Design a protein with these regions (language model features):
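Eukaryotic intrinsically disordered, low-complexity regulatory linkers and tails enriched in Ser/Thr/Pro
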Residues: 1-99, 103-173
């Protein structure tokens, strides 16, 4: 039995927690974090299945085929709303810390092996991850969102152009 997923585009990040009962929590601006009994990737998978009829494995396969990113790549949930989550693995946990690109502002080094992630509304989170790795993940997320948006726009332009001239599109033969 499926329940409505708790994740939505307003999520700032999904962070693993050290708790007896919960594995992670979804952090939103202006409201209390929502703890979950599931790992971070299971929350994302549940959202993709419920709203988009796909799963995390399919999105990763597409990422590998279309963008040549093989591991730890950003997941485009919905490019129209710019809902993109990118992972930051921490050395202490295999349960990745996921950041919503829409709410991300910047990251700064915060000591040895630590990075501070700044969100656009003033919230900050400190993670046990290398600063250069965080920057690389951010750049990947921007590149993937940019390409997927351009691919969608180009496809729409191609179809519109053929409809204008009353020509059937050549891919339906």
């Amino acid at each position: 039995m499926f329940t409505t997923p708790s994740l939505n585009p307003g999520v700032c990040c999904i962070e693993p927690v050290r708790h007896v009962e919960f594995l992670c929590q979804a952090v939103y601006h202006g409201r209390a974090p929502e703890p979950s009994h599931k790992p971070t990737e299971a929350l994302i998978d549940e959202l993709l299945i419920y709203y988009y009829g796909t799963n995390l494995a399919a999105r990763r396969a597409h990422l590998k085929a279309a963008h040549a990113i093989h591991r730890m790549g950003p997941i485009v949930i919905d490019e129209r709303m710019q809902f993109v989550l990118f992972p930051i693995t921490t050395s202490r946990s295999r349960n990745p810390f996921w950041v919503n690109l829409h709410h991300f502002l910047m990251c700064t080094p915060a000591g040895e092996g630590m990075t501070e992630i700044h969100f656009n509304h003033g919230m900050m989170k400190r993670v046990a991850a290398d600063y250069n790795f965080c920057e690389k993940q951010y750049e990947k997320a921007l590149r993937v969102l940019d390409r997927s948006t351009k691919i969608r726009e180009q496809s729409a332009l191609y179809i519109t152009r053929h409809q204008k001239h009353d020509q059937p599109a050549p891919f339906g033969r």
